[in-house]
Amino acid sequence: MAKGKDARVSVILECTSCVRKNVNKESRGISRYITQKNRRNTPSRLELRKFCPYCYKHTIHGEIKK
């Protein structure tokens, strides 16, 4: 039997340095990744170091609202 809410949810990770640069129009775009997280194990916002093709380096990507 399945319980009420699923533990796994899809989340979108967005580059934090591209978001800051986009205000000044220095960046060509904003890097985003789609991944899954377990809501029970990580109830807080997810932050991972991923490669950003617009910054050409590994940066911190934070979870955003859908």
UniProtKB/Swiss-Prot annotation:
Keywords: Chloroplast, Plastid, Ribonucleoprotein, Ribosomal protein. Its main location: plastid. One of its GO terms (cellular component) is ribonucleoprotein complex. The gene is rpl33. Coiled coil: none annotated. GO terms for molecular function: structural constituent of ribosome. Gene3D superfamilies: Ribosomal protein L33 (2.20.28.120). PROSITE patterns: RIBOSOMAL_L33. The keyword Transmembrane does not apply. Belongs to the bacterial ribosomal protein bL33 family. This is Large ribosomal subunit protein bL33c. It is found in: Plastid, Chloroplast. It comes from Fagopyrum esculentum subsp. ancestrale. It holds the Pfam family Ribosomal_L33. One of its GO terms (biological process) is translation.
